[in-house]
Amino acid sequence: MSEEQKLPKEPPILLPGAADFTEEQIEAARVFFAQPVSFIMGAVRMDAMPPSDLPEVAFAGRSNVGKSSLINGLVNQKYLARASNEPGRTREINFFLLAEKVRLVDLPGYGFARVSRSIADKFQDLGRAYLRGRANLKRVYVLIDARHGLKKVDLEALDALDVAAVSYQIVLTKADKIKPAEVDKVVAETQKAIAKRAAAFPRVLATSSEKGLGMPELRAEIVRLCIDE
């Protein structure tokens, strides 16, 4: 195991929305996410994707919301998932294999304005096809910038997930960039906004990949979904 993959053993820092996990569950998740992880492939067509033989969790969100940083933070690597220098330029669904047991899936960002409408529609259609066609998809984590909360384009994405009947959970990113009271407020507002959405998991988790906030709980949530169930 490389030094980069070794996750430091440290007590979890809880933020609003954190689940009630035991210390043993948090530690087991830390160990699981310290196992080897690698980029498998980027797919631009459904027939080019890996087989549906392993559980998957996917990450969605507006361009520049911090998807790459979150994925890298989960596995404690800096450059596994690479962010595009220009918003909206990631046009593939990227698959990463963790511990030979779970796939982490990075979906193309939405809500960008620097690509043509036809190109935007093409890879948003790819994302929708993935959501409808993956029986092994355990959950979609929809990332929302804690500084801005839910935007219209986010609500449209949630509508699509509801229609597809795909289980999803809101994860607030960059929670370290605002005051704790503001984090509490945006968590409460977001939970209220999704309360009547059938496919939404009711708990909103606040995180910061830069500070490690909420990451132990998110790891434990993924392990519970993909390994324990």
Curated annotation (Swiss-Prot):
One cellular component (GO) term of this entry: cytosol
CDD domains documented for this protein: YihA_EngB
GO biological process assignments: division septum assembly
Binding-site positions, GTP: 61-68, 88-92, 106-109, 173-176, 207-209
Cross-referenced Pfam families: MMR_HSR1
Cofactor: Mg(2+)
Residue span, EngB-type G domain: 53-228
Keywords: Cell cycle, Cell division, GTP-binding, Magnesium, Metal-binding, Nucleotide-binding, Septation
Molecular function in Gene Ontology: GTP binding; metal ion binding
Stretches assigned to coiled coil: none
Listed InterPro entries: G_ENGB_dom, GTP-bd, GTP-bd_ribosome_bio_YsxC, P-loop_NTPase
Chain segments annotated as transmembrane: none
Residue numbers binding Mg(2+): 68, 90
Domain of life: Bacteria
HAMAP family: GTPase_EngB
Family according to the record: Belongs to the TRAFAC class TrmE-Era-EngA-EngB-Septin-like GTPase superfamily. EngB GTPase family.
Function, as annotated: Necessary for normal cell division and for the maintenance of normal septation.
Descriptive protein name: Probable GTP-binding protein EngB
Gene: engB
